[in-house]
């Protein structure tokens, strides 16, 4: 059910916890606390291990562990240098040299240098379960040229290597070299390089993360602390954000003008275009009937034709999105990369057509054998698809519920499931799910989406994200994905993109629904400097995985 929001009087929660042993942070009554909501948690577990993205707290990367470089996606991946001051990629695209920033200290006062970078990458190499981005498939070795210069040797020519390299967290060698098992280490008292490293308060319902006393860029930091309240679901979030308790959020708000913006002139939002959202099916399903259905391309096409995408956008997202009728999932934001012949050839399979879906199912042998109103497989097996979305993700939950109803119209039996995110995610990693609704990364070009969503090299190994866990494999597709950045020539990349598009579209690997928006809300009551339509410096979200949030927080200043 969509949340029914009542407007309440604006209130500001004041945290009066005194700080001790941390002279660089003002007392709680005086300091500026930026209240953020990067992710839903049913309870907080004190885990600040930057290599454990599935279980850590989502203010760990960027804010505790600063990257070498932030590539600003909205500005064409323009590099903004952080722990590094420069990089240079070799003409043959087989190595990258990073010049590190001198004068940087870890939060405990120890000096940051090349040894920390070398250690961090070797740690991921020795412990592949810590490799969240697949960097081990790109980097063969790391060399120390001097105390502030590091060379990365690349396995194959890759013009995008710097972008991939900076995704790996850099941790202090002097701390982590004594950790026996980094894959289970929760890092409760972190030593970091970013702006907020000090855990001032921690409970299951609230933690406050305060300024690094040795932050190298402290002159540009005006926020004293991040305040992170525990929020379990969208309904709980809506109560807080409408009440004026939150400063920086990136969650779904139904009917945002009426429920949020109307509550206060200080309640602002900006929703720049974002990436693809789609239904993913499990090609490795252990159940014979479900496997027979899900691995049949005409069944996937009929599933796709059953979806009234515009209705889903209008109801589940209150109009916040664009229909994605590309069988490849490419989306109109990347239309300049599209082979329009391929797009049009398969567009009909990604357009709402109830009768067409029924005809395609019948042609493929899916008929109602037992007269229960739903189709059975061509071999006569009955099945019911369980379609999952994470609990509390109201827009996703409503999307799935609408899809279940629309699938029933063409004779496909399905039921919605809303497990906690960790359960949802694990089911995808272990191939124990039927169908899942997910969003995807959105980059400066389509490769980030396509590679993370379809490269079979990302379907195995601990720490891999969920996006390619449909377990569809195509060697030619993998080859094209892996060759995209072996050239820096845009015309050659366009030709490769057309080949990628053709394969994914022809096989209808996933069922794209829409191109979403970067949901972002901000409150001007307590802070100024927010990114918005008039100040579009970068992707504005507070989510982990958006490194631009580091640059964003440095632009914020408390209201005097």
PLM regions: where:
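Gram-negative bacterial Sec-dependent N-terminal signal peptides
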Residues: 1-27
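Extracytoplasmic/periplasmic ligand-capture domains
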Residues: 3, 71-74, 88, 97, ...
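Cleaved targeting-peptide boundary
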Residues: 26-34
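Intrinsic-disorder/low-complexity, polar/charged segments enriched in Ser/Thr/Lys/Arg/Asp/Glu/Gln
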Residues: 33, 93-97, 149-151, 225
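N-terminal lobe/hinge region of extracytoplasmic solute-binding protein
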Residues: 37-91, 122, 191
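Short, glycine-/polar-rich solvent-exposed loops and beta-turns at beta-strand/coil boundaries
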Residues: 80, 133-136, 320
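Surface-exposed binding/hinge segments that line
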Residues: 88, 99, 133-178
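Active-site-proximal polar cores
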Residues: 513
């Amino acid at each position: 059910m969509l949340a029914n929001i009542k407007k309440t009087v604006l209130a500001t929660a004041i945290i009066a916890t005194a700080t001790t042993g941390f002279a660089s942070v003002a007392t709680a009554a005086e300091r500026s606390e930026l209240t953020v909501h990067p992710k839903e948690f049913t309870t907080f577990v004190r885990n600040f291990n930057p290599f454990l993205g599935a279980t850590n707290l989502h203010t760990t990367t960027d804010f505790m562990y600063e990257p070498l470089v932030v590539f600003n996606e909205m500005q064409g991946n323009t590099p903004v240098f952080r722990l590094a001051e420069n990089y240079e990629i070799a003409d043959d695209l087989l190595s990258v040299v990073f010049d590190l920033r001198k004068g940087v200290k870890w939060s405990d006062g120890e000096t940051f240098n090349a040894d920390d970078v070398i250690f961090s990458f070797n740690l991921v190499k020795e412990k592949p379960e810590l490799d969240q981005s697949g960097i081990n498939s790109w980097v063969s070795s790391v060399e120390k040229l001097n105390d502030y210069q590091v060379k990365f040797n690349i396995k194959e020519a890759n013009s995008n290597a710097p972008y991939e390299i900076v995704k790996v967290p850099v941790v202090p060698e002097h701390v982590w070299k004594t950790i026996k098992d980094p894959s289970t280490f929760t890092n409760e008292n972190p030593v970091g390089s970013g702006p907020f490293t000090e855990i001032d308060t921690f409970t299951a319902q609230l933690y406050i993360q305060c300024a690094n006393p040795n932050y190298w860029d402290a002159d540009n930091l005006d926020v004293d602390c991040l305040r992170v309240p525990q929020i379990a679901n969208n309904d709980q979030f809506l109560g807080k954000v409408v009440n004026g308790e939150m400063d920086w959020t990136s969650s779904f708000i139904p009917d945002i003008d009426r429920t949020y913006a109307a509550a206060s002139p200080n309640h602002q939002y900006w929703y720049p275009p974002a990436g693809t959202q789609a239904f993913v099916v499990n090609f490795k399903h252990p159940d014979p009937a479900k496997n027979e259905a899900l691995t049949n391309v005409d069944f996937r096409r009929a599933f796709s034709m059953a979806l009234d995408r515009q209705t889903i956008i209008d109801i589940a997202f209150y109009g916040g999105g664009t229909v994605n009728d590309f069988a490849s999932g490419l989306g109109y934001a990347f239309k300049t990369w599209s082979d329009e012949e391929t797009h049009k050839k398969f567009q009909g399979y990604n357009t709402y057509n109830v009768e067409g879906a029924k005809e395609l199912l019948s042609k493929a042998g899916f008929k109602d054998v037992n007269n229960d109103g739903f189709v059975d497989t061509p071999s006569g097996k009955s099945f019911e698809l369980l379609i999952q979305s994470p609990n509390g993700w109201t827009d996703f939950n409503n999307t799935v519920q609408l899809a279940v109803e629309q699938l029933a119209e063409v004779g496909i039996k399905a039921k919605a499931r809303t497990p906690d995110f960790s359960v949802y995610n694990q089911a995808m990693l272990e191939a124990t799910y039927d169908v899942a609704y997910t969003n995807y990364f959105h980059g400066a070009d389509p490769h980030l989406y396509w590679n993370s969503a379809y490269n079979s090299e990302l379907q195995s190994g601990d720490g891999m994200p969920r996006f390619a866990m449909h377990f569809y494999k195509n060697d030619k597709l993998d080859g094209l994905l892996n060759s995209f950045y072996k050239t820096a020539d845009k015309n050659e990349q366009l030709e490769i993109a057309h080949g990628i598009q053709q394969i994914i579209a022809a096989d209808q690997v996933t069922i794209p629904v829409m191109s979403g928006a970067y949901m972002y809300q901000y409150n001007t009551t307590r802070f100024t400097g927010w990114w918005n339509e008039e100040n579009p410096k970068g992707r504005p979200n507070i989510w982990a995985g958006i490194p631009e949030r580091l640059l964003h927080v440095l632009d914020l200043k408390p209201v005097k």
